[in-house]
Amino acid sequence: MPSLIVFVSHQLPQDEALRRIQAAVAHAKVQHSDKINDLRDSWSSYVGAFEVSGMGFKGSGMVSVNPSDVTVQTTIPLAALLFKSRIESGIRDALTRILA
């Protein structure tokens, strides 16, 4: 599966950035429950692993909350490759909003 890596810089303390990312994941589980069949995440310090399925697609990846940026690494199913730039910009926009 093709991969996608998105970096977004932030000016927050690392713990606050982590809190915001984790809260956004919890919110997404509820807000998008009609589109997401399953969203699982597990955290070890400042690194989170996730698996998601919905709308006929499955994906997985990692989120790293670093002192000055957040990095999302994920796989994209071949069937969704046409939407790679849209997925990337959606992740970037969401992270930018969360970390503002």
Name the predicted role of every residue range.
Residues 46-48, 70:
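Hydrophobic residues embedded in beta-strands of well-ordered beta-sheets
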Residues 48-54:
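Short beta-strand segments that buttress and anchor functional surface loops
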